Amino acid sequence: MSEPQPDLEPPQHGLYMLFLLVLVFFLMGLVGFMICHVLKKKGYRCRTSRGSEPDDAQLQPPEDDDMNEDTVERIVRCIIQNEANAEALKEMLGDSEGEGTVQLSSVDATSSLQDGAPSHHHTVHLGSAAPCLHCSRSKRPPLVRQGRSKEGKSRPRTGETTVFSVGRFRVTHIEKRYGLHEHRDGSPTDRSWGSGGGQDPGGGQGSGGGQPKAGMPAMERLPPERPQPQVLASPPVQNGGLRDSSLTPRALEGNPRASAEPTLRAGGRGPSPGLPTQEANGQPSKPDTSDHQVSLPQGAGSM
């Protein structure tokens, strides 16, 4: 009779269970790690024990201060904490301050007067051993106490008006000066007089007042006009209303001044502006009965 063979299935089943347990623990650890990572992103902290809580609480406030601090504040704090930088900063502040005095209480005033320094508020600086900036400044020799701010101040020039000043920056208003302007040839002329009014810089009006100046046209150098005999204007031309050169009397041809000034008036009425009228000579004026009337001068009657 054959003997029954032993069953080998239980060892294989145990091996499979071992691999299954390892896989389950691996998956649980992976899931726990992912949960901690997600909670850490949301702001939670995953701890393995309670002993680390006080240490984390002590480290948390400095981190908040560093996050709230600005870069400039950190630089200033580092500069002030250094004693050498604090002394240099104190010297700079002492040189740049002006001569301002502040009223103090009676106790501070008496103590400062006994020391020989003016009344002031006592100042305290970080990182410096000096009790007061003004007290240490008063102990310096007088040559050192002179501020450098006075050297930078410049005297105001003539014609400048200071609008406002901030520190060493000033805004000034400069008044414009109107004087004599020179031509290219070097002769000074005043541009304040213009064409209005007909006045020249010599004080004359028109062509008859004052001496003509050098460089003026030739017509302004003519002598003043003399009174001429009573001569009425020649009859105007029918089509244009202007005097014809062929009808001009011969007596006027000898006077270049009278012939150079043509007379224009409506209808040919009234005497010429360059000749004296009858009213100027004291004779009563007669009514003009004809619009076209020509009177020759006294010497031209015999011609």
Swiss-Prot record:
Keywords carried by this UniProt record: Cell membrane, Membrane, Phosphoprotein, Transmembrane, Transmembrane helix
Tissue specificity comment: Primarily expressed in spleen, thymus, testis, peripheral blood leukocytes, brain and placenta. Not detected in prostate, ovary, small intestine, colon, heart, lung, liver, skeletal muscle, kidney and pancreas.
Signal peptide feature range: none
Main location: membrane
Protein name: RELT-like protein 2
GO biological process: positive regulation of cell-substrate adhesion; positive regulation of p38MAPK cascade
Role noted for this protein: Induces activation of MAPK14/p38 cascade, when overexpressed. Induces apoptosis, when overexpressed.
Membrane topology field: Single-pass membrane protein
Pfam families referenced in this protein's UniProt entry, alphabetically: RELT
Cellular component aspect of the GO annotation: basement membrane; plasma membrane
Annotated gene: RELL2
Biased composition (Polar residues): 278-296
Comp. bias intervals (Gly residues): 194-212
MF GO annotations: collagen binding
Record PANTHER family: RELT-LIKE PROTEIN 2, RELT-LIKE PROTEIN 2 RELL2
Known partners and oligomeric status: Interacts with RELT, RELL1 and OXSR1. Interacts with PLSCR1. Interacts with TRAF2.
Post-translational modification: Phosphorylated in vitro by OXSR1.
Subcellular location per the Swiss-Prot or TrEMBL entry: Cell membrane
Transmembrane regions listed in the UniProt entry: 15-35
Organism: Homo sapiens (Human)
Organism ancestry: Eukaryota, Metazoa, Chordata, Craniata, Vertebrata
Disordered: annotated span: 46-67, 132-303
InterPro entries: RELL2 (IPR042313), TNF_rcpt_RELT (IPR022248)
